[in-house]
Amino acid sequence: MAKIIKFDQEGRNAILKGVNTLADAVKVTLGPKGRNVIIEKSFGSPLITKDGVTVAKEIELEDKFENMGAQLVKEVASKTSDVAGDGTTTATVLAQAIYRQGSKLVAAGHNPMEIKRGIDSAVETIVAELQKISKPIKDHKEIAQVGTISANNDKTIGGIIAEAMEKVGKEGVITVEEAKAMETSLETVEGMQFDRGYLSPYFVTDPERMEASLENANILIHDKKISNMKDLLPILEQTAKSGRPLLIIAEDIEGEALATLVVNKLRGVLNICAVKAPGFGDRRKAMLEDIAVLTGGKVISEELGFKLENATFDMLGTAKRVTIDKDNTTIIDGDGSEADIQGRVKQIRAQIEETSSDYDREKLQERLAKLVGGVAVIKVGAATETEMKEKKARVEDALHATRAAVDEGIVPGGGVAYIRSLGALEGISLPAEQQFGVTLIKRALEEPIRQIAQNAGVDGSIVVDKVKNGKDAFGFNAADDEYVDMIAAGIIDPTKVSRSALQNAASVAGLMLTTEAMIADKPKEEAAMPAMPGGMGGMGGMGGMM
């Protein structure tokens, strides 16, 4: 297929046009007074959002060369969202500012490679300075403030996220779901929960709530199907003698084995319940091992040399309480030894570090949370489906940002941290051409605060000047249109977000500046429609048929 090639300034101008188109659509959402963007959907109602990365992901331009520029900036937003969960609009604004200034310098005859080196040195210095300014997050209140800012100043969301973090701890899993009601609420699960319910409703001990509750229960963990009653007999006899309830977790329990368990339960001989093992394949084996470690039992598996008919009572795990409903099983206060649990946690953490798959990482994180913290579910409520989608996206953003804040600490928000770190660039001494890159970063770092002010209907230059003349956390609160101590006012950004936004923006803008040729497919010529064939005349003669 034939290609079109653009060189030098012609190519860079096309990139700039694409960058500007995408960035101008995204940056209207920045800050507390940022505007909404409405996105048409092929199905259902349009999507209304104030999330930069959502806007960026929807943009495809008709011109292939301009689209390349837009797609590269989209990459900045996506990467920042993946790493830090927030800061996508800031990253887009920075990328546009760096590339716009840089392309002017290159057009004026400066060496793009030297400018890029200057940009890289400046960014390194700023990142080090941001880490110096950064303060560790101390309490519930600061976690709530980070969540509030990231959720576009929604204090309810900030409060719920802080509460969830407090309940399940740093390692805990917090998931976001759609609620059936109008209110947004938080549900937490103590202990280990997995999504498998009882195999028969006859196991229920509380008919009103339709759940089985076993106090001081023994737990049998088996990785194969149980269909033959003979295999289970030795364990059941010992359970009947001990008088304690028994939970059986196996790949499946069917036929004669299940029928016998139900009959014994109904006659009151045994207080028993059976559930299927969670997960599939290798993940199932790992989860059964987790349950065994948590409850101080052993997985009865032929792979490990244990047969079910030879299982002894000391292979069973124990827990203070087990609750089973039709969908979930929750094991509370397992009797596993602390040392074994910590060893297992260490092992899972090592796997999280090594894995390259996001899906695997998420599943490992869930397993870790079940062992150490617990699970919290934020149920997002709203009046309409459109509002629900928008709100759920905000909650997810806020959750990521809060985790980032707990990881690396916080800096003053509203673009102030960038202004405060500018002083570090004064001490940099580089060759003249590279110094242009440093000057360019100095100008670009003012852009987020300018845009926040502009979206609030205030002159950005005046705000930048006033903030530069202030000290420490002094900055512009666009929500109330006043100058305040940003940290005291709760306007804070996670350091990880500010750092990632700048690093990703500078990385992609630097690559675009050093581009000398662009190649794209030539648009296909659409063939013209063929003319109507002749010979269709003469139909009028049919009038004589009357």
Swiss-Prot record:
Catalytic reaction equation(s): ATP + H2O + a folded polypeptide = ADP + phosphate + an unfolded polypeptide
Pfam families: Cpn60_TCP1
Gene Ontology terms, MF aspect: ATP binding; ATP-dependent protein folding chaperone; isomerase activity; unfolded protein binding
Compartments, as annotated in UniProt: Cytoplasm
Broad class of where this protein is predominantly found: cytoplasm
CDD domains on file: GroEL
Documented EC number(s): 5.6.1.7
GO cellular component, one term: cytoplasm
GO biological process entries: protein refolding
Function (record text): Together with its co-chaperonin GroES, plays an essential role in assisting protein folding. The GroEL-GroES system forms a nano-cage that allows encapsulation of the non-native substrate proteins and provides a physical environment optimized to promote and accelerate protein folding.
Similarity section: Belongs to the chaperonin (HSP60) family.
Protein name: Chaperonin GroEL
Organism: Geobacter metallireducens (strain ATCC 53774 / DSM 7210 / GS-15)
Taxonomic placement: Bacteria, Pseudomonadati, Thermodesulfobacteriota, Desulfuromonadia, Geobacterales
Name of encoding gene: groEL
